[in-house]
């Protein structure tokens, strides 16, 4: 065998010895032991070692049904054979290149087939990059700086996107960015009209997610979305629809529902089939901002933009998420929400749409209740998001769904009883 292809033992790393028994806790070579602030669940966060289909296994050997799905990304579960094969083939043919490659073009064709109102797409490596890039297009096209967001709606980790969060999220964001970011309450039409009037001629973009999770997983009202569209038309503002999460809910996403067509869409997560991806989609007019043949085009690169592995895996993921798959997920979601509403107890409210659902305490410290629920569901073999959001994958069997609902309902009742005993919320 070619010496370069021989398997060699990996060098033992200095830090390995410092892993806690069975690797159960985070590693001290990572700040806080973790790689993302969204992983934080308290001091003793379990570590995952493997995923297959709708399941993951942790370092203690626990098996869980994964409704976290890497924060809604893995709409077909882990290691779907067709997606794995596509990624393997793409890797074998060269994982990334310094020139255009066909997988990017094929992915764009498949994506735009689902979005007939749009002409072109520019890829990046995350939803955060996609939102930041869409904002830059809006600023370049309008010659203005300000952008309107919904309070607490999450749009990633760019400075502008973090400005929508609370004090903690805004730490480290420059005063200049905070000043250009107008953050308004969800569905407050009067506030939107006032902000546009007050900052007339200075607003480049309104950024909307039709079902913003961190803002409470409550839908943007149709009249709000339509008014935003009207204001954009009247005042020359670019409407950006963030579909990084919601694209899983309908074949062409939900940003354009009710006759509201955003000028730009931002995508990510599922469209990479579990590999890093982000995308800005738009009409030819705005997307011309990226065209390097045009004078004054935007500078936009990215070493891994449109890399063949994400593109090929993502194309298969998109193909598999056809209307039939989405309809089945809608049915599973409706069943889960109905059962949880009936069985989780009066202390909880169940919200969501399609394959997304989330539990909220009717009173008390929501984040604390939801984190407790994360642990209580974990103990019963179900992995939620730390905000108690669940994303159902297409590979979930009907039996698995019922098991998940049993576990979450029982966990919810346990948390409510404990919190009531501690005097937090209505219990
Ligand atoms: C609505 C929305 N937009 C943007 C992002 C950022 O995507 P990424 O984490 O890929 O940067 C997220 C991430 O969860 C999101 O939920």
Predicted regions span which residues?
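Conserved N-terminal phosphate-binding loop of PLP-dependent enzymes in the Aspartate aminotransferase
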Residues: 3-427
């Amino acid at each position: 065998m070619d010496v370069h292809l021989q398997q060699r033992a990996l060098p033992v790393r200095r830090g390995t010895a410092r892993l806690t028994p069975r690797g159960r806790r985070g590693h001290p070579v990572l700040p806080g032991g973790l790689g993302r602030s969204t992983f934080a669940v308290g001091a003793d966060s379990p570590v995952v070692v493997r995923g297959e289909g709708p399941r993951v296994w942790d370092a203690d050997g626990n098996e869980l049904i994964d409704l976290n799905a890497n924060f809604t990304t893995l709409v077909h579960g882990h290691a779907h054979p067709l997606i794995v094969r596509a990624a393997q083939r793409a890797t074998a043919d060269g994982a990334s290149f310094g020139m255009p490659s066909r997988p990017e073009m094929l992915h764009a064709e498949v994506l735009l087939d689902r979005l007939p109102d749009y002409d072109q797409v520019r890829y990046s490596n995350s939803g955060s990059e996609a939102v930041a890039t869409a904002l830059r297009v809006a600023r370049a096209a309008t010659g203005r700086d300000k952008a309107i967001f919904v309070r607490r709606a999450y749009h990633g980790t760019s400075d502008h996107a973090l400005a929508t969060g609370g004090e903690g999220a805004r730490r480290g964001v420059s005063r200049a960015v905070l000043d250009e970011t107008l953050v308004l309450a969800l569905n407050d039409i009067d506030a939107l009209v006032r902000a546009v009037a007050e900052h007339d001629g200075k607003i480049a973009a309104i950024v909307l997610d039709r079902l913003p999770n961190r803002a409470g997983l409550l839908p943007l009202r149709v009249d709000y979305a339509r008014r935003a569209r009207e204001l954009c038309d009247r005042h020359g503002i670019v409407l950006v629809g963030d579909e990084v999460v919601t694209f899983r809910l309908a074949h062409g996403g939900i940003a354009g529902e009710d006759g509201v067509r955003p000028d730009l869409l931002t995508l990510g997560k599922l469209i990479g089939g579990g590999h890093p991806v982000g995308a800005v989609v738009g009409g030819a007019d705005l997307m011309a901002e990226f065209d390097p043949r045009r004078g004054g085009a935007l500078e936009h690169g990215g070493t891994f933009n449109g890399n063949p592995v994400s593109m090929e895996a993502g194309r298969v993921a998109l193909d598999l998420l056809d209307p039939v798959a989405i309809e089945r997920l809608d049915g599973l979601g409706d069943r889960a929400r109905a059962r949880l509403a009936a069985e989780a107890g009066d202390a909880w409210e169940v919200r969501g749409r399609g394959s997304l659902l989330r539990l909220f305490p009717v009173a008390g410290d929501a984040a604390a209740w939801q984190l407790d629920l994360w642990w209580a569901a974990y103990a019963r073999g179900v992995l939620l998001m730390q905000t108690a959001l669940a994303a159902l994958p297409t590979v979930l069997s009907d039996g698995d769904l019922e098991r998940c609902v049993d576990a979450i309902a029982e966990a919810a009742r346990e948390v409510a009883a404990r919190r009531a005993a501690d005097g937090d919320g209505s219990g």
